[in-house]
Amino acid sequence: GFEGVALKKAWAIAKTESNGRPMAYNGNRNTGDSSYGIFQINMLGNLGIDRKEKFELKSNILLFDPVINAEITYYMTQGGNDWSSWPSYNSGKMKEWLGKFPS
């Protein structure tokens, strides 16, 4: 799983995306979202089809399981090394949480 700096970034992304809530859902299709869980994995359109197949998900509801959500996020970020698919990383919004990581 996530370790060191990657763990801090993962925590900050989760806090920014969902405030750490495993049952968070953003279904705003106007903004291109159908995002699930703690890391807000987007399943809209072809993204969802590809991700369901790649991660053997029978239903998007499984993404509300924080362990499954984190495992998929770990894979998608190449072990926490590439967060470029997360707008909160690209915009820098997650930085406000980096300094608040629990010690």
What are these regions (language model features)?
Residues 1-20:
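Export/targeting segments at the very N-terminus of extracytoplasmic proteins
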Residues 9-12, 23-103:
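Catalytic and binding regions of secreted/periplasmic enzymes and modules that target cell-wall glycans
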